[in-house]
Amino acid sequence: MQLYLYGSGKRCEILLKFIKYTPYKVCGIIDSNPAKWGTEIDGIFISSPQELIEHNEALVCVTFYSTIVHEPIWDVLEQKYRIKRYNLLSFYDIMIEAYRNIARIDKVGLCNRNHRIFFDGSWGLGLGGVESWLKDIMRLFVEYDISNCFLLTHLDGTTIPDCIQNRVLDFSIAESGVYTPKEVQKAIDFVICNMPCTIVLSRIDEVMLAAFLVKENYPEQVRIIMVDHGSCDGMYRDILSFKSMIDKYVCVSSGIKKELIKRGVAEEIVHTMTAPMPYEDNLIRKYSTEFSKPLKLGYAGRLEVFEKRMDILLKLIMRLEYKHVKYVFNIAGSGSYEAMIQRFVYDNALDNRVRLIGNVERDKISSFWEKQDIAINVSDNEGRPISNMEAMLSGAVPVVTMTVGATEDVADGRNGYVVPICDYESMAEKIKYIELHRDVLCKLGTQAYIDMKKKINPKQYVSMWCKLLYE
């Protein structure tokens, strides 16, 4: 079967190593970057997407997902290049096909051991909302004495809280996302050795591929629960490649739930959750209500362009400068864009207004937000930003982009402000408005706290998870 690969990046190179294990033959690589046209990978030429119009009966595998504003949406491939929906494949459609021929699934008898539940964190628990959520849910399971639940990750002694150390199994994947036969087989062997079991996944990785392949062979011995933390088209594509073996979905926002149902997932197996987090019973804090004082802006999270759009954050800062907004911007976090931000601050002599303060520990994040008037989020893809929820629980006014996750909690003009994705000009205008109308800080900040507080219910949350895991 003739196949085009759309996208010439890392995932394309990975697929080219596994195509020989599938019935597909790669006849070309497509990329939207003109600089790559005419070059080749493994002897296969890279061409313009226009080539798809001439070969619209061929299969097309979209190999990647990128930032949501640049991503090749399947609908666009249908409408613009006349590629039939049934001819569109994802990266994982190919990987599943290949590993059905590569993987070794040992034959075992019926296992009678206690059913155990494994939350996958095999890529490592660095900085990030998903990683924080995994540690938090383990804490709750310990607190509520929920047994037989374990976290799979690298037990390095630095990122694991003491209270959950005995709930962590030292299992990790080297170079997660590369899908080497050695690491995929390692995950397969783990699943088989621990049947019967439930695997709870928060991203598509080697453990998901392994659980899928084992469940195909032992459907009664393995249950798969997918927690969807993201809302971009590529993430939906990836997840739905495993649809036939996923027992339940848990979505971090109602918008994600609606989209999965729209894409063919049965409504009765799709659930939503609001993860609990600490907050004070009463909101006691101060705002920068005097016009002579600068507004205190805050950001907490990964310092990356991918999804978090730190490049847009810098453009926002320049617009604030242009509009002569009085502000101090405290940026908490770390990431690959950190050096670029530091250089930007130095080049524009902003060190008295823009401060990079590094990572803030989870138990100190409330104190961080209590000192900020406004919480900034410029992401182009958010499933449900934990940082934004934490900010609202501390009374910071959210000014955010219109992602599915942010709008789950932020209502424009009620408890914060929402602007279109990448629209840093409108965001700067909202901040300028707040500067000129300081009374809205207390009004919106208090409402943000009230609205977010109503959604937090640890007992209800644990009860929901117990039903999902044990019924």
PLM region spans:
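Nucleotide-activated donor-binding/catalytic signature segment of Leloir-type glycosyltransferases, i.e.
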Residues: 342-360
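Conserved donor-binding/catalytic core segment of Leloir-type glycosyltransferases
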Residues: 114-120, 289-308, 314-317, 330
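Short hydrophobic beta-strand element within catalytic cores of glycosyltransferases
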Residues: 152, 397-400
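Short alpha-helical donor nucleotide-sugar binding micro-motif in glycosyltransferases
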Residues: 359-360, 367-372
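Aromatic "clamp/platform" in nucleotide-sugar-dependent glycosyltransferases that forms part
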Residues: 380
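Conserved acidic donor-binding segment of nucleotide-sugar-dependent glycosyltransferases
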Residues: 412-413, 417-424, 433-438
